[in-house]
Regions:
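A short, compositionally biased
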Residues: 134-136, 181-182
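C-terminal and late-domain segments of enzyme folds
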Residues: 142-275
Length: 275
C-alpha cells in the first residue's frame, strides 16, 4: 500500500474468516484506508505490516474451528508472524481481534499479556456453558478504569455475539486476579434490568458463562484489544434488530453504535502515529 497521511488498517482474510468486508467498510466510513490480504500472503511477506497502523483480526470460523476455535489461526500468528507482530506491538501500533480474532489472539499469547509478557495459557475462550452456538444481541458496558483505548467514550452498547466458544476462563484464580487488578478487563456483559455486570450464570445476558462477565480484554498498554461481541455488525442504525420501533419512538441513533469502537482506534492513530 502506498503510504498516505491516513490511518491504514490491515485485515487478514482466508481460511474461513468471514467478517473482513464489513470490517473494512466500518473503517472506511471513518476515513481510514484498508487492505484485505490473505493471511498466507502476510506470512510470506511480513514486512507489509510496517505499512499499517492497525491490524484487525476479524471473526469467522477459521479452519472450521478444528481443534478449538481460533487455535490453528493462532498457530499461524505465533509461529509464522511472532517476531513481526512483536515489532508491530512494540512500535506502538494497534491490534483488535473480534470473536474468532480474539480467540486467536488469546491462544497465540498476544493477549492478555499479563505484566507485558506475551505468553500462552494465561486465559482461554472455551465452550459456552449453554452448550449451543449463541447468536443474539447483548448489552455490554466498559470498565472505566481500563486503559483500553478502544472503549473510550462508550457508556453502554448493544451488539451481537455469534460464537460457540466465548467463555472467558483462566488457569487459576491468581491469573484472573492479576488481569482484574491491572484493569485489563475492558468490557463486561450487562444485565439491562438490574444494571449490574452479568456474572455467570446470568444467562442469556452473559451468553457464554464468562467468568465475572468478561466480554473483552486488553493488554497493559490498552492498545492491544480483543472482544467477543461484533462491533462491525452494527455500522448502521438499521442493523439494530428493533430499528423500526426505535425509529417510531424517535430514538434511532444517527449511526451504528459499533462504529465507536473502530473510531477510537482511528482517532488514536491520528493523534499518536501520524506525523
Amino acid at each position: 500500500m502506498a503510504r498516505t497521511n491516513k490511518p491504514r488498517v490491515l485485515i487478514p482474510s482466508g481460511q474461513g474468516l468471514n467478517c473482513e468486508e464489513e470490517t473494512a467498510f466500518g473503517y472506511k466510513i471513518l476515513g481510514a484506508e484498508t487492505s484485505i490480504v490473505h493471511i498466507n500472503d502476510i506470512i510470506a511477506k511480513p514486512a507489509m505490516l510496517e505499512d499499517y497502523h492497525i491490524l484487525a483480526l476479524v471473526g469467522g470460523f477459521s479452519d472450521g474451528d478444528h481443534i478449538a476455535s481460533g487455535k490453528i489461526h493462532a498457530n499461524r500468528l505465533r509461529y509464522g508472524l511472532e517476531r513481526p507482530l512483536g515489532r508491530f506491538i512494540d512500535d506502538g501500533k494497534l491490534i483488535i481481534g473480534v470473536c474468532n480474532g480474539f480467540q486467536a489472539m488469546v491462544k497465540a499469547g498476544i493477549l492478555p499479556a499479563l505484566d507485558n509478557k506475551r505468553e500462552t495459557g494465561m486465559m482461554t475462550l472455551t465452550y459456552n456453558d449453554s452448550g449451543i452456538f449463541e447468536d443474539r444481541w447483548i448489552h455490554i458496558i466498559p470498565n472505566k478504569k481500563s486503559k483500553c483505548i478502544w472503549t473510550k467514550g462508550i457508556e453502554e452498547i448493544y451488539l451481537p455475539v455469534r460464537h460457540g466458544e466465548g467463555k472467558a476462563s483462566f488457569p487459576s484464580d491468581e491469573a484472573l486476579r492479576r488481569l482484574e487488578s491491572a484493569n485489563q478487563v475492558a468490557l463486561y456483559y450487562l444485565n439491562p434490568e438490574t444494571r449490574k455486570i452479568a456474572k455467570e450464570p446470568d444467562y442469556p445476558n452473559n451468553p457464554n458463562g464468562s467468568i465475572n462477565g468478561i466480554a473483552a480484554v486488553c493488554d497493559p498498554t490498552g492498545r492491544i484489544f480483543g472482544m467477543m461481541p461484533h462491533w462491525e455488525a452494527f455500522l448502521s442504525p438499521y442493523n439494530h434488530p428493533n430499528w423500526t420501533r426505535l425509529k417510531t419512538e424517535g430514538k434511532l441513533p444517527k449511526e451504528g453504535l459499533g462504529l465507536q469502537v473502530a473510531r477510537n482506534g482511528v482517532e488514536y492513530v491520528k493523534d499518536n502515529l501520524l506525523g
